[in-house]
């Protein structure tokens, strides 16, 4: 066999090995995702006796004016309460903490509203045929962020409570625009007036309450959610920074008016640092009986 044939054979073997590793990594990752989703389902808790299973507009009495307008804009009286959701996205993710390194992603997210939790399973296309797999989750009061090249080579693996869990609960709370019945007072959220276009909402999961600022547009729809401080990883160091999500492209899904497009950013001293832009491609709900 000539030298060139040996080279060609070697390249072919490397390509086959690469495909094999990619398939193995995806299989391992998918197994880990199934385990996380099983834990998410196992942590679900029944509603307390007497908790409404359908939205009743009378519970809006006494809420801040912009919050009342919001619920009237996105819910109809008698709407069943969302207990779980499955959300598929496409979009782009900025892989650089300081620059602009946008890469396309696809993801599937499982959400349960009681006990609050989610599992986000994403694939970010770093190189052709070699995605970065990401799990971002809040399960049973604990946060998780795990990223691995090809599902095999770990880039980040953070798990536990503290600021990590708090940050993941912030994500769940901010994304409640996708499952807005979870923001109702009957579902445990407390609202406080700020002005005619904004209000603070507080959610408690476990021991610590979490408060975010919600802003609404002229039509009553939620346009942004802000936290004054969320933990941001820069290298191996966690720093606190304001954090904001913006919502747009509202559509009606199963009787709920929800945003199908959004972006998330850090609000840094040097300016706004957007790192996630996404669009919902599929949205399916599970409702209270």
Segments and roles (model prediction):
Residues 2-35:
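N-terminal type II signal-anchor transmembrane helix
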Residues 29-86:
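N-terminal leader/targeting segments and the immediate start of mature chains
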Residues 64, 192-196, 226-232:
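Short, positively charged
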Residues 68-153:
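N-terminal mature ectodomain segment of secretory-pathway/periplasmic proteins
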Residues 82, 108-120, 133-146, 194-198, ...:
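Short, solvent-exposed coil/turn segments at beta-strand boundaries
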Residues 127, 151-154, 230-232, 266:
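Short, surface-exposed beta-strand-loop junctions and turns on beta-sheet-rich folds
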Residues 146-205, 238:
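Flexible, processing/modification-adjacent segments and terminal tails
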Residues 200-287:
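Gly/Pro-enriched, hydrophobic low-complexity segments
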């Amino acid at each position: 066999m000539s030298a060139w044939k040996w080279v060609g054979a070697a390249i072919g073997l490397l390509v086959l090995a690469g495909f094999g590793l990619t398939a193995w990594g995806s299989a391992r990752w998918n197994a880990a995702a199934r385990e996380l989703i099983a834990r998410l389902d196992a942590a679900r808790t029944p509603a307390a006796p007497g908790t409404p299973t359908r939205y009743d507009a009378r519970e809006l009495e006494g809420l801040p004016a912009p919050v009342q307008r919001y619920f009237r804009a996105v819910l109809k009286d008698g709407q069943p309460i969302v207990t779980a959701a499955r959300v598929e996205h496409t979009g782009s993710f900025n892989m650089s903490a300081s620059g602009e390194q946008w890469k396309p992603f696809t993801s599937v997210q499982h959400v349960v509203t009681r006990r609050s939790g989610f599992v986000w399973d994403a694939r970010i296309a770093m190189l052709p045929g070699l995605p970065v797999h990401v799990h971002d989750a809040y399960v049973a009061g604990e946060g998780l962020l795990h990223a691995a090249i090809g599902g095999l080579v770990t880039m980040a693996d953070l798990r536990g409570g503290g600021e990590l869990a708090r940050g993941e609960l912030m994500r769940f709370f901010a994304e409640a625009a996708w499952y807005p019945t979870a923001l109702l007072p009957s579902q445990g959220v407390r609202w406080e007036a700020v002005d005619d276009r904004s209000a603070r909402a507080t959610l408690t999961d476990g021991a610590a309450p979490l408060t975010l600022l919600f802003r609404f547009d002229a039509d009553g729809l939620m346009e942004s959610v802000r936290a004054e401080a969320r933990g941001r990883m820069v290298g191996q160091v966690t720093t606190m920074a304001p954090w904001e999500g913006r919502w747009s492209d509202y559509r009606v899904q199963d009787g709920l008016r929800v945003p199908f497009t959004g972006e998330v950013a850090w609000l840094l001293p040097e300016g706004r640092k957007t790192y996630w832009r996404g669009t919902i491609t599929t949205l399916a709900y599970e409702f209270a009986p």
